[in-house]
Structures are given as structure tokens and as C-alpha cells.
From Swiss-Prot:
Pfam families (UniProt xref): GCV_H
Organism ancestry: Eukaryota, Metazoa, Chordata, Craniata, Vertebrata
UniProt xrefs under InterPro entries: 2-oxoA_DH_lipoyl-BS (IPR003016), Biotin_lipoyl (IPR000089), GCV_H (IPR002930), GCV_H/Fam206 (IPR033753), GCV_H_sub (IPR017453), Single_hybrid_motif (IPR011053)
Gene3D superfamilies: 2.40.50.100
Subcellular location(s) per record: Mitochondrion
Modified positions (N6-lipoyllysine) in chain numbering: 98
Keywords, comma-separated and alphabetical: Lipoyl, Mitochondrion, Transit peptide
Annotated ranges, domain Lipoyl-binding: 57-139
The protein's name in its UniProt record: Glycine cleavage system H protein, mitochondrial
Protein family: Belongs to the GcvH family.
Lipid biosynthesis keyword on record: no
GO cellular component, one term: mitochondrion
Gene Ontology biological-process annotations: glycine decarboxylation via glycine cleavage system; protein lipoylation
Amino acid sequence: MAWLVLRRLGPVLAPRCPRLSLRPQVPAVRRLGTGSLLLSARKFTDKHEWISVENGIGTVGISNFAQEALGDVVYCSLPEIGTKLNKDDEFGALESVKAASELYSPLTGEVTDINAALADNPGLVNKSCYQDGWLIKMTVEKPAELDELMSEDAYEKYIKSIED
């Protein structure tokens, strides 16, 4: 019913209220890619860490698969800001009621920030592993290393292959 009203009144109201326009609104496009390092899609390692890069800074966390496998995270050990990491270097650990798991750097770079909220609330890793439960932020010294990581689709296929 509301659709019919909008369809009839949309052309009349659209000039006064752009939100009622029937034309699809195209969102602003931001260039994606490792060349500019403005914004990259989330990439994954075979050790279940992810990284998303914006303006040359990578945000690192663990995948949903990893947090489900770990169970309730009760403690996070993270590096100090300024720590220099090479790709695949161990940079910390997560402890859960089930197990402990080391964390590995997806890229070469320097730690610029840690998620201090995890000290008081490590369960954020479980509740919001791709948003509030991020672990560290780091510079991206070798952008070509991003190409060695898996896309989200490739990671999902990887997960299915190890589950079978």
C-alpha cells in the first residue's frame, strides 16, 4: 500500500523531498585497491586473521570462524604501540575458556594502535569480531603483501575445505 502511495506521490514530492525520489540513488564511489591504499576490502590469512586497510592503516582482527572455534574470549595479550612486525610474526594471543590461540601479523608494518577496550571487555572479540572486537591497527609497509591474502569469497571456500 505504501509503495502505491509513494509511486503516485513520489514524482510530485521528489523535488521537495529528495528521499522520496523513485530514482535509485548511487552512493559515492570510493576507489578500492591496494595501489592507492585508500580503502581495501577485508582480506584474510590462513591463520584466520583479517585486515582491512584505510588510508594506509590496517585494522586487524580474527575471523568469525576463529572466534567461534575459540569460544568465549576471556583474555587478550596485545603488543605495545610502536612494535615492528613482519608478515606472519606472532604479535599476541587470545585466551578463551576452551583454548589459547596465538595471533599472527597479516602484513609487515608497525603497530599504531591497540584496542584498549579489550582489556576490560575481551568478549568484544566474540560479540563483534569485525567491528568493535578489532585487535590492532598497523602501518602497511609492503602493500604487495595484501595481494597474497585471501578475499572474503576465497576465505569462505578455504573454511569449507578445512571443515570437510
